[in-house]
Amino acid sequence: MKGTIIKGIGGFYYIKIDNSEEIIECKARGKFRHTELTPMIGDYVEISVDKNNKGAIEKIYERRSELFRPAVANVTQALVVFSFKNPDINIDLLNKFLLLCEYNNLKAIVCFNKMDLVNKEDYKDIISMIEQAGYDIIFLNAKEERNMDIIKKLIKDNVTVFCGPSGVGKSTMLNKIIGKETMITGNISEKLKRGKHTTRHSELIYVDEGLLVDTPGFSSLDINFMEKEDLLHCIPEFRDFIGECKFTGCLHHREPNCAVKKAVEEGHIHKNRYDFYIKTLEEFMNRRKKKW
């Protein structure tokens, strides 16, 4: 039998069988330990069931994509959920999420939730920065279901991961999409202005001919596994200027006659995005120096 892993808890994996509502609990065969291949949420697998009705994962099919934090396979797009207020937006964190989406070849769609709390005009520079980078934006008020119909259309025929900092309303959005509360949503802590971490595990849910992944909340991202060469290819605004710099292998940092720096000066690339790139690049370079 074949199916998709929709949940994994404590070494047990729950597989939804193709063309069926049946879900079978399985363990992974020991052979996967020798290949260092660990089953992930979203994996398409082949399983066997013995006479005692015990399931085992026999084969993991090739993954189209692979995320490690959160650990999810075969995702096609990411809804990057933030709010301008409650909690206040962290631009560097937003840029890190977008960076990871690019690294993993995921289409990223930025969703600003809790729009009832703010005046959009007060944040037009941030909005302009995201649009200039080529990302679509959806403005939401999930509690009142504002524009949630757009989200539902996007989900069809995709494997979609919800990501973003804690407290911005990811679980509320998920609850509205599937029409019932599958997860307990936490109130914002007045002291920390952060949501309580009430999403306890990653789970894949079938909704309207699409698949959704909701993951445990987190407020920071580690991108230290990336190299500076990766970074160059994860800022989409830079791509139009590839090959136009004086020096081959230009890092768009201190090099003269740099087409990217010129584009920033002329307003073709938003300065905040370039500043984030330089800050991240220097962190990578300093990390490499420490290794030596």
Swiss-Prot record:
Binding site for Zn(2+): C245, C250, H252, C258
Names of the cofactor(s): Zn(2+)
UniProt cross-references to CDD domains, sorted A to Z: S1_YloQ_GTPase, YjeQ_EngC
E.C. no: 3.6.1.-
Assembly: Monomer. Associates with 30S ribosomal subunit, binds 16S rRNA.
GO process annotations (BP): ribosomal small subunit biogenesis
GO MF annotation: an example: GTP binding
Primary subcellular site in the record, as a coarse category: cytoplasm
Family (UniProt): Belongs to the TRAFAC class YlqF/YawG GTPase family. RsgA subfamily.
Alphabetized UniProt keyword annotations: Cytoplasm, GTP-binding, Hydrolase, Metal-binding, Nucleotide-binding, Ribosome biogenesis, RNA-binding, rRNA-binding, Zinc
Compartments (UniProt record): Cytoplasm
Pfam families associated with the record: RsgA_GTPase, RsgA_N
NCBIfam families linked to this entry: ribosome small subunit-dependent GTPase A
Organism: Clostridium botulinum (strain Loch Maree / Type A3)
Domain CP-type G: 64-221
Binding positions for GTP per the UniProt entry: N113, K114, M115, D116, G164, P165, S166, G167, V168, G169, K170, S171, T172
Class of enzymatic activity (EC top level): hydrolase
Lineage: Bacteria, Bacillati, Bacillota, Clostridia, Eubacteriales
Cofactor note: Binds 1 zinc ion per subunit.
Record-level GO cellular component terms: cytoplasm
Protein name per the record: Small ribosomal subunit biogenesis GTPase RsgA
Function statement: One of several proteins that assist in the late maturation steps of the functional core of the 30S ribosomal subunit. Helps release RbfA from mature subunits. May play a role in the assembly of ribosomal proteins into the subunit. Circularly permuted GTPase that catalyzes slow GTP hydrolysis, GTPase activity is stimulated by the 30S ribosomal subunit.
